[in-house]
């Protein structure tokens, strides 16, 4: 970690203090994760400008979730306790290709220090936000070549949702509070999804005409977006 910090022009702390993060989902058999701050306030120079490296931490990995069913969760312990170098940047990247470039540069730095690399060993979380939008975290991105496309699609999604929001406001749209029971009405439906449901409820989306089917990103509609929240 000290070598990594130097390669990222960081200020190394005078003393390393081990902290405990409580873990309550069972992925750490001790009930907590050991972590500590190694360095702060670094930077990388990229073709798109300087990117600030806020912090470099050292922590231990958790167990890997295998399956959850019938109220029980199974974990694999093969990576439990493995040291992790956690690198955090500030929000100074403004182009999808810059995100990929920074990820590549970080990978090269880690490679030079013999840190284990490759799919499954390096996990990157992307925090994406735009003007008028919300910050969205996409966890566990592993493929460098997909990174710019992931950022592009999330920006596309947020821009589409902002446009829909403005249109709904212009229409004075609203979601009516009353919940309707459709079990009897749809008793003879041919829809397999509705047939398999224990019960069918509905609400009136006043002013949403024509927007539910609007695409917010390839393969995802506004209706899919609403369904994700409902689930």
Could you say what each language-model-derived stretch is?
Residues 1-231:
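Basic, nucleic-acid-interacting segments
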């Amino acid at each position: 970690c000290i070598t990594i910090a130097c390669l990222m022009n960081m200020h190394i702390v005078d003393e390393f203090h081990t902290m405990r993060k409580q873990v309550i989902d069972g992925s750490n058999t001790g009930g907590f994760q050991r972590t500590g701050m190694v360095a702060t306030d670094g930077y990388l120079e990229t073709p798109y400008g300087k990117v600030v490296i806020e912090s470099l931490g050292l922590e231990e990995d958790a167990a890997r979730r295998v399956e959850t069913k019938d109220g029980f969760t199974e974990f694999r312990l093969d990576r439990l306790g493995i040291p992790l170098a956690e690198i955090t940047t500030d929000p100074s990247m403004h182009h999808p290709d810059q995100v990929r470039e920074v990820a590549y540069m970080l990978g090269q730095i880690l490679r030079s220090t013999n840190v284990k690399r490759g799919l499954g060993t390096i996990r990157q979380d992307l925090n994406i936000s735009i003007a008028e939008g919300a910050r969205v975290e996409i966890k566990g991105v592993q493929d460098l070549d997909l990174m710019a496309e992931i950022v592009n699609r999330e920006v596309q999604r947020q821009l589409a949702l902002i446009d829909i929001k403005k249109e709904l406001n212009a229409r004075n749209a609203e979601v009516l509070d009353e919940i309707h029971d459709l079990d009897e009405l749809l008793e003879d439906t041919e829809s397999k999804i509705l047939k398999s449901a224990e019960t069918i409820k509905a609400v009136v989306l006043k002013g949403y005409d024509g927007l539910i089917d609007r695409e917010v990103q390839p393969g995802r509609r506004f209706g899919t977006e609403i369904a994700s929240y409902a689930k």
